[in-house]
Amino acid sequence: MPIIKVRDNEPFDVALRRFKRSCEKAGILADVRAREFYEKPTTARKRAKAAAVKRLAKKLSRENARRVRLY
């Protein structure tokens, strides 16, 4: 769990914002949402594979767009 130290004369809002940012960087909220409901292993594998395919398609489309702009 992220820990922040509140500095002297630091407003509460600023400290809360720093804490939220550190939680987001640590990926706590995403992890909690992922574990909110049980996901069968087959469903998890299927979701991970779909994400990998999507990443690959995005990468290829970026490379193709770069090639088109070079000409």
UniProtKB/Swiss-Prot annotation:
Molecular functions per Gene Ontology: structural constituent of ribosome
Keywords: Ribonucleoprotein, Ribosomal protein
UniProt-listed InterPro entries: Ribosomal_bS21 (IPR001911), Ribosomal_bS21_CS (IPR018278), Ribosomal_bS21_sf (IPR038380)
One Pfam family in the UniProt entry: Ribosomal_S21
Superkingdom, taxonomy of origin: Bacteria
Single Gene Ontology BP annotation: translation
GO cellular component term of the entry, any: ribosome
Keyword Ribonucleoprotein: yes
Family: Belongs to the bacterial ribosomal protein bS21 family.
NCBIfam families: S21p
Name of the protein this chain belongs to: Small ribosomal subunit protein bS21
UniProt organism field: Shewanella woodyi (strain ATCC 51908 / MS32)
